[in-house]
Amino acid sequence: MIRVAENDAGVTVAGHAGCGPPGQDIVCAAVSVLVQTLALSLNRLSPGETVYSMEPGSATIRYTSLSEKGRLLVCSFFVGIEAVAAAYPNNVTVTRRGSQ
């Protein structure tokens, strides 16, 4: 199960989808590309606002305040990640800030 969580400090992603062998798991690939795109886009389009780390099975994107552009990028990430979670509810969960 991949768990995506938003909190006041940023976004964390942890776990494995378990939908296929390593390198062939389409759910893991979808989540990975969305997370990497968010981190790289924030870094490039809103420089200085974020710090991120990525390792196999986990990623953390930290931010304390975001510009309007940065907030739009985060919202866009959640549109995509929530679509993946809706399509694969047994493999991906999403918790948004304020939704607990």
Residue ranges: model-predicted function:
Residues 1-26, 33-100:
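N-terminal intrinsically disordered, cationic/polar leader segments
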